Amino acid sequence: PVEAVIVDVGNQRQQTFLNAPEATVMGVEAEGKKYFEFADQAAFISNKRWLVQANYTWSDSDVSVGEGDTVITLGGGGRPEQASFFIQDGSRLQGQSEHVANLQLGWEDDTARSQATFILNYVSERITARGAGVGTAREPDYLQEPGAVLDFVYRKDFTVKGRDLGFALELRNLLGTDFEEYQEKGNKIRINQYDLGQSASVSLTARF
């Protein structure tokens, strides 16, 4: 597997990539989807099919590094270096989160030719780049916890003068989730943090 690693090149710290010797990944995924109808309720509710859909994935990984394994990095001048200096044996695969979940709540209205969905995604902590070193002198890995992101999508089809049109509204990151990359060695050290912002997009399409 290809992994990002932080290396010192002269007086600068740079990110490069290397091939980890070996990794094992295992996991379990569960998914469910159900529509609900409420015929005896008010028209706004009874005209629609209400959707509940969820997906959850648990995964675990293990990177294996032996004594004789070598890698070539940006700062090594093309010479093979000990892989164990850059990757800790038994550590989690870079970019892999233990928990990934998705929840969708929405409705579909065939009469009004419309649908709306709230989409909640959650991703737990993951490694974004390796810290190099040996023993207690090893630089902590760079970590990120994407957290929860909530989006809303609305679509409606309609006809004007015999022409089929489609309207779409998309609202992204309603919870205002930020990006944060950090190291942990006793205390949390922020490496990179910024506001992802919230966005909205509107589109109108014509079908020919």
Predicted regions and their residues:
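Membrane-topology and secretion signals of cell-surface/extracellular proteins
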Residues: 1-4
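Flexible hinge/switch segments at interdomain interfaces of large molecular machines
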Residues: 6-8
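Gram-negative outer-membrane beta-barrel transporters
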Residues: 12-130
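Short, contiguous acidic/charged loop-to-helix segments that flank catalytic cores in large enzymes
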Residues: 19-21, 89-93, 137-145, 190-191
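Strand-connecting loop/turn motifs
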Residues: 45-49, 98, 109-113, 147, ...
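C-terminal beta-signal and adjacent terminal beta-strands/loops
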Residues: 121-132, 156-208
